[in-house]
Amino acid sequence: MGIRFILMVNKQGQTRLAQYYEWLTLEERRALEGEIVRKCLARNDQQCSFVEHRNYKIVYRRYASLFFMVGVDDDENELAILEFIHLLVETMDKHFGNVCELDIMFHLEKAHFMLEEMVMNGCIVETSKANILSPIQLMDKAH
């Protein structure tokens, strides 16, 4: 397994979306998220987007007011994960039109659905924006 978890966090450190691909208790998740968020938010724009934490490599990127953080195994390619984050943001932009924190908050199920289309059991399985968004567009038409 490559990807262990994906977090979307605002500038104040509030988690807006969390998707885990390994089992952790709620207490372990809260502690892990708190540690990672503090570590990443304390860094400045000139520092590298890769951080080691516990037994994870954290790859993160800031888009507007949201930080996208992905925890991966040591042997995962950091640049590929940065590209994955960019693809996720582009996909959300295409659906929501310049995605922002409120889009995630009010359409959390769609954000999770996009992630579920892209990542299965910690492995990236879909990179086509059209294929990722197709089921969501069908659901939107049905409502």
Curated annotation (Swiss-Prot):
Compartments reported by the entry: Golgi apparatus, trans-Golgi network; Membrane, Coated pit
Q: Name one GO cellular component term.
A: AP-4 adaptor complex
Where is the major localization of this protein?
A: Golgi
Is Membrane given among the entry's keywords?
A: yes
Q: Which domain of life is it from?
A: Eukaryota
InterPro entries assigned to the protein according to its UniProt record, in alphabetical order:
AP_complex_ssu, AP_mu_sigma_su, Longin-like_dom_sf
Function, in words: Subunit of novel type of clathrin- or non-clathrin-associated protein coat involved in targeting proteins from the trans-Golgi network (TGN) to the endosomal-lysosomal system.
Write down what this protein is called. AP-4 complex subunit sigma
Organism of origin is: Arabidopsis thaliana (Mouse-ear cress)
